[in-house]
Amino acid sequence: MSHIRNFSIIAHIDHGKSTLADRFIQMCGGLSAREMEAQVLDSMDLERERGITIKAHSVTLHYKAQDGKTYQLNFIDTPGHVDFTYEVSRSLAACEGALLVVDAGQGVEAQSVANCYTAIEQGLEVMPVLNKMDLPQADPDRVKDEIEKIIGIDATDAVACSAKSGMGVDEVLERLVHTIPAPEGEIDAPLQALIIDSWFDNYLGVVSLVRVRQGRVKKGDKILVKSTGKVHLVDSVGVFTPKHTQTADLKAGEVGFIIASIKDIHGAPVGDTLTLSSTPEVEVLPGFKKIQPQVYAGLFPVSSDDFEDFRDALQKLTLNDSSLQYMPESSDALGFGFRCGFLGMLHMEIIQERLEREYDLDLITTAPSVIYELELKTGETIVVDNPSKLPDVSAVADFREPIVTATILVPQEHLGNVITLCIEKRGVQRDMQFLGSQVQVRYDMPMNEVVLDFFDRLKSTSRGYASLDYHFDRYQSANLVKLDVLINGDKVDALALIVHRDNAAYKGRALTEKMKELIPRQMFDVAIQAAIGGQIIARTTVKALRKNVLAKCYGGDVSRKKKLLEKQKAGKKRMKQVGNVEIPQEAFLAVLRLDS
């Protein structure tokens, strides 16, 4: 056991975590040269296309150190994006140490700071590594200084390497086996294992990735899942090298998978404890705090026949991504679907793409909204995550919106643009610190301003240099109103929005203009209106397509022409009374792209 090292790699997006992981696998001979490819661990198509890590991946490697001993390295590659911090905290719970990878050109960014604090809070040994040293703009002294100033860990002897060229990677491994402590635990004690991740395989059932704290588990053992109390027979255990490799057993301190033909999707929840059925009194390990979704949106199948398949797909995805929550909902415009909770906009896009690709579904998404707290005049407090469920304005005494504390790290030359953007998004500055060439600003901002397009706008105003980390702080009273969209006088529940009263008229005009472009012309005029309560604040009209009924009249009396035009007008009027307007999918997403 003294030769096992469990560690995670934490870093900001694009600082080279997955490439460093590739080098480790190559140097320790985890895969042959033929099987090696760039970003081996990012196995999902989506991860490769977007160049980001979404799921944490674990690998077990054997490294022969210079002191002649062979060490077993269990390492977990973690995502760097702010929406997937939950994956990171889960991975860290299985480790004794973490490599903090920082790009030697760009320096410390907000996400590395946040993940690093999580690691330090969980009592891990953090080892700084400077990556991308082969780039001409690498400035190791400045970056070491930033690590010490911003994060507060000693970086004087941080290892310099370049994951791309392979320079200094062996030095990283050497330092790692000596810096990161060995796991603690008794091999002879009763089994106690923590489920870090699980996914559903159509042939094998639920596959669980576990970190064994105490004892051992082997094929043929009967294991007990503590939360459900059910007993399962272990079919096989093993590790990823990154290939599935079966082993005789998993012992205390190791990370590997257990397959026990669990067919029920909720049979082995993430964060649960496994033990042997012969020792049911083993205490439950502290799991992970359940994470609360920040953004809610409705997902509806285009064809109502797909509803059951959609439900199954969501169940399987929730097993693999436990931060996703969902409940059934119905909409007048879109039929039956689910209201889903996500950690952020990127998370929502990824889930929607995974549902469409992996489960072959066609989905319509409504505009996302955050959770609001309402105090009614009766004194009761309710929470609302869907604008169409808002009670009448006259019944509400106080409207409270969620406020987040956003920490932004930005080079000094882009500070002005970032401050302007934060003020536009109704932010209130908390403090500002100058750290070398970077500035750290903290703002309190309404969550609905942050989750929609703030990240993209921040990147574009700072030319990609600013980085962001945010967390929920509190609820605060605000002057909010519900903006309804009416098409030909009928409210469309799926298009309702909650906006600040000051922006309502502008948003209303922008939304009706956008809808006018997206709704195809019909045989009759289509009136698109935006309303707050009973007051219409904006209107546009999609003009009718009309046939030239006068084409056949050459000359002749004017009363003949009038008669034909009146007849056409009467026909259009009749059509309008019975006609339905088809709203295309783009119109539901138009709400997202309103430039505030």
From Swiss-Prot:
GO terms for cellular component: plasma membrane. Keywords: Cell inner membrane, Cell membrane, GTP-binding, Hydrolase, Membrane, Nucleotide-binding, Protein biosynthesis. InterPro entries: EF-4, EFG_III/V, EFG_V-like, EFTu-like_2, LepA_C_sf, LepA_CTD, LepA_IV, P-loop_NTPase. Pfam families: EFG_C, GTP_EFTU, GTP_EFTU_D2, LepA_C. It catalyses: GTP + H2O = GDP + phosphate + H(+). Residues 2-184 form the tr-type G domain. GTP binds at D14, H15, G16, K17, S18, T19, N131, K132, M133, D134. Belongs to the TRAFAC class translation factor GTPase superfamily. Classic translation factor GTPase family. LepA subfamily. This is Elongation factor 4. It comes from Pseudomonas putida (strain ATCC 700007 / DSM 6899 / JCM 31910 / BCRC 17059 / LMG 24140 / F1).
